């Protein structure tokens, strides 16, 4: 008996810093991580502090729509 919506979903986290628009950096792009979250425990958008290889520092990564 499967439910309509799964409790655990795979989400994508994207760097909120403007990595792609920094012209002084050597690498251009946007840092993205994939992870899972439980919809019952965290119904809101997830925000985690992760390492961005394009900024070379820890920045806030927010959940994005698929």
From Swiss-Prot:
Gene3D superfamilies membership: Ribosomal protein L33 (2.20.28.120)
GO terms of biological process kind: translation
Keyword Cell inner membrane attached: no
Localization per Swiss-Prot or TrEMBL: Plastid, Chloroplast
Keywords: Chloroplast, Plastid, Ribonucleoprotein, Ribosomal protein
Disulfide bonds listed in the record: none
Domain of life where this protein originates: Eukaryota
Name the record gives this protein: Large ribosomal subunit protein bL33c
Originating organism: Physcomitrium patens (Spreading-leaved earth moss)
